[in-house]
From Swiss-Prot:
HAMAP family: MnmC (MF_01102)
The family this protein is said to belong to: In the N-terminal section; belongs to the methyltransferase superfamily. tRNA (mnm(5)s(2)U34)-methyltransferase family. In the C-terminal section; belongs to the DAO family.
Entry protein name: tRNA 5-methylaminomethyl-2-thiouridine biosynthesis bifunctional protein MnmC
Gene: mnmC
Subcellular localization(s) per the UniProt record: Cytoplasm
UniProt-listed NCBIfam families: MnmC_Cterm, PRK01747.1-2, tRNA_MNMC2
Keywords for the protein's UniProt record, in alphabetical order: Cytoplasm, FAD, Flavoprotein, Methyltransferase, Multifunctional enzyme, Oxidoreductase, S-adenosyl-L-methionine, Transferase, tRNA processing
GO molecular function: flavin adenine dinucleotide binding; oxidoreductase activity, acting on the CH-NH group of donors; tRNA (5-methylaminomethyl-2-thiouridylate)(34)-methyltransferase activity
Presence of keyword Disulfide bond: no
Pfam families referenced in this protein's UniProt entry, alphabetically: DAO, Methyltransf_30
UniProt superkingdom: Bacteria
Catalytic activity: 5-aminomethyl-2-thiouridine(34) in tRNA + S-adenosyl-L-methionine = 5-methylaminomethyl-2-thiouridine(34) in tRNA + S-adenosyl-L-homocysteine + H(+)
Region (FAD-dependent cmnm(5)s(2)U34 oxidoreductase): 261-657
Biological classification of the source: Bacteria, Pseudomonadati, Pseudomonadota, Gammaproteobacteria, Pseudomonadales
């Protein structure tokens, strides 16, 4: 695919952008800033609603047509100036053709008044690929969820309650595919009680469609030369949400304290997302510091193993990659991470065919094919083939990311605290260790990989451990030519601290974490398959595997290779409540889900933890805070811990897989 998923723009004599595809302007030529304030802010009472927010309150705005981000920045400015300091703004917007960062910067330069907000947006506006993309701004106080794609495909996948709608986008005459009854029905489904809507158009079919969907809109004075526009409240009953087994548990009022077990990527990310929302978090770690197990490798690779068919896993990976990539901007490039790119070699005919399909399915700025000569020039070493290049990817020092995530005044890291048992007493979870209670709180998040099975055996979660070993190879002047991560069956990364990381093995049977000479030898063989040239530069022909340093750890994965992220039901009560599904899987009983109150899971990330674990922290926080989910509803449900009990019930099997 080319870069055609980005907006194709022309610029007029005043430096204002016009859409080449729709033949329409992005905002009023007279004064786009004042148009936004009149149409969307004033007629949704945004300033008044910000002023009325309670301490710790939240305003959720939904928008069709992100465009130049002008509406978002105006709403953010109003929120910053009028809302309580501990309030939060969630802004959810759909955009089929996002602007490039260069075009966005040029467009926003028209509004110097918004520069403090535009600068933050531009700093985070990277890896904006198809699907859901979450951007954290103003220290996490402002959350922007961009849905990149067609509005009628994105909105049905949104799980949110919207307080105010900015119904924007190109004019109905220019973009009739958007302005349909299907759109108005989705706006109604997503509206919170008391929601409002405003739009620049006063077209009769739009007004009639909105009224039919439950919006009591009226024609009011428009902006500038536009005589009329539409605005009004949502007055219908809110639509029911998910099936009960995927519904959001009710959280007891004031329960904004949590214990997180496990200070790897999943645990640190969960703690960070909760702390950003004002939660006090106790982070329990059985070792001396964060990232001492699977998250402790010197270099991990941001590698996107995708499908050309838009699978749930692919959508999770693209969304997670964007989120992690934006988080990495907080770290020190060169020592903590590097966006050096990742090259996946087309090492055989089957892989080459798979890569051709991927190159046709995804935009060039996410991945594109390189022939062998270009791949060698990009990598700086000789290669056996060309492959797919991911220009925004690279390597990460996972402990640095974990430390950054855990550094928050509301997070208390407690090392040398090994959890041995759990109990629920007086609406609080108690975590007990060898010498008594380690911590207690109304909410408990288990982010301790396969150890969840030991702490919660009755849940029968099908988590499994897979041993992996990396090898550390001393770099030399010749090997410093390597400029990108290169992958085949294994991977090798450019040097960090004068060492290349090489890996990684997969062992489904061993429980021994002592690095083995045999697996060092296996990793060296993986290196030779990646690049005989680099292997020779590193003198592997004379290198004794027994002299290599390395480390081994357990990956934690699930049977469907998706993580487990979200709340968990009590197994026996779940089976009783939904026994009818064993006879008819189409039934959706109204019985509320028998949740294990206050218990959440963030585990099973396998070898993709760098990509999926940080965004999963946001997903946990969204479940707890009843916020817009950062992932498509279908993806969030596919990652739900209850899915295994549900499958077991429907299939009538004894296995939860």
């Amino acid at each position: 695919m080319s870069d055609a998923h980005n907006a194709q723009l022309d610029w007029d004599e005043h430096g204002q952008p016009l859409s080449r595809s729709y033949g329409d302007v992005y905002f009023s030529r007279a004064n786009g800033l004042e148009e936004t304030r009149h149409v969307f802010l004033a007629h949704n009472q945004i300033i008044e609603r910000c002023q009325a927010l309670p301490a710790g309150g939240r305003l959720v705005i939904g928008e069709t047509g992100f465009g130049t981000g002008l509406n978002f920045l105006c709403a953010w400015q109003a929120f910053a100036e009028h809302a309580p300091r501990d309030a939060r703004l969630h802004f959810v917007s759909v955009e089929k053709f996002p602007l490039t960062q260069t075009d966005l910067q040029r467009a926003l330069a028209l509004w110097p008044e918004l520069a403090p907000y535009a600068e933050q947006l531009l700093a985070q506006y990277r890896a904006i690929h198809p699907g859901f993309q979450r951007l954290l701004l103003d220290g996490g106080r402002v959350v922007l969820t961009l849905m990149i794609g067609d509005v009628l495909e994105c909105l049905p996948q949104l799980d949110a309650r919207i307080d105010a709608w900015f119904l924007d986008g190109f004019a109905p005459a220019k973009n009739p595919e958007m302005w349909t009854d299907s759109l108005f029905t989705e706006l109604a489904r997503l509206s919170a009680p008391g929601a409002t809507l405003a739009t620049f158009t006063s077209a009769g079919f739009v007004r009639r469609g909105l009224i039919a969907a439950g919006f009591a809109v009226q024609r009011v004075k428009g902006f500038g030369h536009k005589r009329e526009m539409l605005a009004g409240p949502f007055q219908a009953e809110p639509a029911p949400r998910s099936a009960p087994w995927f519904a959001r548990p009710t959280l007891a009022a004031g329960a904004r304290q949590a214990v997180v077990i496990g200070a790897g990527l999943a645990g640190c990310a969960t703690a960070a997302s909760l702390a950003a929302r004002g939660w006090r978090v106790t982070l329990l770690e059985r070792h001396d510091d964060v990232a001492r197990e699977a998250s402790g490798n010197p270099q991990g690779v941001l590698y996107l193993k995708l499908s050309a068919h838009g699978t749930v896993l692919s959508r999770l990976i693209v969304a997670g990659f964007g989120h992690t990539r934006r988080l990495l901007e907080r770290l020190q490039r060169g020592s903590d991470w590097d966006a050096c790119g990742v090259l996946q070699l087309a090492f055989d005919a089957k892989e080459a065919e798979r890569q051709n399909k991927l190159a046709a399915a995804f935009p060039d700025d996410l991945l594109h094919a390189l022939p062998q000569t270009e791949a060698e020039a990009r990598a700086g070493i000789g290669l056996p083939a060309g492959g797919l290049f991911y220009p925004d990817a690279g390597w990460v020092h996972p402990p640095a990311l974990c430390r950054q995530l855990a550094q928050h005044p509301l997070i208390e890291l407690r090392p040398y605290q090994e959890a041995l048992s759990l109990s629920r007493q007086q609406e609080r979870w108690c975590v007990e260790g060898q010498n008594g209670v380690l911590a207690e709180a109304p909410v408990l998040i288990l982010a301790c990989a396969a150890e969840i099975g030991r702490l919660l055996p009755e849940a029968n979660l099908p988590l499994k451990r897979i041993r992996g070993q990396i090898s550390r190879l001393p770099a030399n002047e010749s090997s410093s030519a390597l400029r990108t991560v290169v992958c085949a069956e294994g991977y090798v990364a450019p040097a960090r601290d004068d060492e290349h990381t090489l890996g990684a093995s997969f062992d489904f049977h061993s429980d021994d974490l002592t690095p083995s000479v045999a697996e060092h030898a296996g990793n060296l063989e993986l290196l030779r398959e990646i690049s005989q040239d680099l292997a020779e530069r590193l003198d592997t022909q004379t290198l004794d595997p027994a002299t290599l340093q390395g480390r081994a750890a357990f990956r934690c994965t699930s049977p469907d290779y998706l993580p487990l992220v979200g709340p968990l039901a009590a197994g026996q009560a779940f089976n009783q409540a939904y026994a009818v599904l064993a006879k008819d899987a189409r039934q959706v009983p109204e019985t509320p889900c028998p949740w294990l109150d206050g218990l959440y899971i963030n585990s099973g990330h396998g070898s993709r933890g760098l990509i999926t674990a940080p965004l999963s922290g946001e997903l946990i926080a969204a479940w707890l805070e009843d916020e817009p989910l950062p992932l498509p509803r279908e993806v969030a449900e596919a990652c739900h811990p209850n899915r295994f009990m549900l499958r077991q019930l429907i299939r009538g099997t004894g296995s939860p897989t």
